[in-house]
Each structure stands twice: as structure tokens, then as C-alpha cells.
Curated annotation (Swiss-Prot):
Protein name: Hydroxyacylglutathione hydrolase
Enzyme class: hydrolase
Domain of life: Bacteria
Binding positions for Zn(2+) 2 per the UniProt entry: 61-62, 134, 172
Record text on cofactor binding: Binds 2 Zn(2+) ions per subunit.
Biological processes annotated in GO: methylglyoxal catabolic process to D-lactate via S-lactoyl-glutathione
Length: 256
């Protein structure tokens, strides 16, 4: 089985567009469809025909180009069953634990409510790829628009059990701000300090910070580390639940 090919590019202001191409079948999936023109440019540049859109959630900056791409390519749009009514052009719904084949590549659906009520992530199991959209960012997580903090914490735990070497592709280039915030709640984390310096250098050169790995996030992302004693001490929350610590970190990030 030939490895998947990926193309990552910017859409809108800070959205990542991602095309996933299976060279054996010619299938190409857009992970969300934030903006038509950059997606078409990437597909044309690579000589790929878009056959699928894998929608993660209903926000406009993730579905804006669904109908235009469907009209041009006749692509199949897959998305979360719990947001079906809000996703333009949806053909097939997916629930937590569902799986399907993209060529010979198994894709498992993980429902991660928090940012929205029905947000899903796509895990390419054998390829060790996770498309986490607005649930898990590099050094961050999505804002909580439709579900409470406890729900997002439990959603993140569903992702945290995946293999450490899993490559994580996320929805926005927010990493520099996330790194600066992370240092305010986990200031003694040496791995975080070195990573923040790396991110400052990458962004100064205009380079993307995607992908990250799940193992790196577990070492440095405060939103996955609410149980960490050092963070709890810094926040003076030693006796609180993981959900309460996570909620405090999220509140601080909202006001950062």
C-alpha cells in the first residue's frame, strides 16, 4: 500500500486547508472546505481531483466551500451525524466509533464535543494521522461554544490515548499565541520552553507549525495536562478535579 500524500496550505486568514491523496485509487479528500480558491489551487497544482470532503464541524470557516467544490467535482461530503442539518451538501453521516475505508486506508471517527456539539475528528489508523480540526491545536484547544469544559476535557482524553507518534493536523495557525499562553500556566516546563522558542523561530520565517505529534502535545500542551502536579501548583488548584483545572486554563486562555 502506497503512503498517503498530503498538501497543507492556508485558507481565509489562519485556517489550514489540507488535501489527502491516495495514489493507488486517485482519491483526494479535503479535510474541511474553508475557502474555494486555495483548495482549487492546491488541487490543480498537484493534479488531483477532489473526490471527498471530510467535514469536522458546522462552522462557516470549515464548510464555506462545500457546495462549490461539490458542484465542480461531484465529491462526496462526509460529516458528523449530530450536526447534519447544518452542513451544506452532506451525503453521509458519521457517529462516534464509526469507521470507513478511503481506498485501502481505514479511517475511524472520534466524536469530540466541546468546540461544537457534534465535532468529529478523523483518525487514519494505520497511517497514524489525526485530523483534529478545532478540538486539539498545537499547544491549544478550541474555544467552547456549544459544550461545557468538562465535555471538552473528556473529548481530549479520547484523543490522548492514541499512539504518541500520531501526526496531528489541526484547523488553525494559532500556535504562536498558544505557546505564549502555555508558558503562563506551565512556566517551569523545560520542554515547553524549548518548543516555544522553536515556534517563535518558525513563525518569524513564515513557516507553518503543522503537524504536531500527540506525544509532543502530551508533554507541552496545558490543555492535555490538567492532571499535572506542576500546573496544579502554579494555579493553586491542587485539590480540584481535572475538569475544574481544565476549565480554569480554558478561561485564562479566553482572556489572554
Amino acid at each position: 500500500m502506497k503512503p498517503l500524500e498530503l498538501d497543507v496550505f492556508l485558507c481565509r486568514t489562519d485556517n489550514f486547508g489540507v488535501l489527502v491523496h491516495d495514489p493507488e485509487t486517485g482519491f483526494t479528500a479535503a479535510i474541511d472546505a474553508p475557502e474555494e480558491a486555495p483548495i482549487l489551487e492546491a488541487a490543480t497544482r498537484r493534479g488531483w481531483k477532489i473526490t471527498h470532503i471530510f467535514t469536522t464541524h458546522h462552522h462557516t470557516d470549515h464548510v464555506a466551500a462545500n457546495l462549490a467544490l461539490k458542484e465542480q467535482f461531484g465529491c462526496e461530503i462526509i460529516g458528523p451525524i449530530n450536526e447534519a442539518i447544518a452542513i451544506p451538501g452532506l451525503d453521509r453521516t458519521m457517529a462516534d466509533g464509526d469507521s470507513f475505508l478511503f481506498g485501502d486506508h481505514t479511517v475511524k471517527v472520534i466524536e469530540t464535543p466541546g468546540h461544537t456539539a457534534g465535532h468529529i475528528c478523523y483518525h487514519f489508523v494505520d497511517d497514524k494521522l489525526l485530523f483534529a480540526a478545532d478540538t486539539l491545536f498545537a499547544l491549544g484547544c478550541g474555544r467552547l461554544f456549544e459544550r461545557p469544559a468538562a465535555d471538552m476535557w473528556h473529548s481530549l482524553q479520547k484523543l490522548a490515548v492514541l499512539p504518541d507518534e500520531t501526526a496531528v493536523y489541526f484547523g488553525h495557525e494559532y500556535t504562536l499565541s498558544n505557546a505564549r499562553f502555555a508558558l503562563t500556566v506551565d512556566p517551569d516546563n523545560e520542554r515547553l520552553k524549548s518548543r516555544a522558542a522553536e515556534i517563535e523561530a518558525l513563525r518569524a520565517e513564515g513557516k507553518f507549525t503543522v503537524p504536531t505529534t500527540l506525544g509532543l502535545e502530551k508533554e507541552t500542551n496545558p490543555f492535555l495536562r490538567a492532571a499535572d502536579p506542576a500546573i496544579r501548583r502554579h494555579l493553586i488548584m491542587e485539590g480540584k478535579t481535572n475538569e475544574e483545572v481544565f476549565a480554569e486554563i480554558r478561561k485564562r486562555k479566553d482572556n489572554f
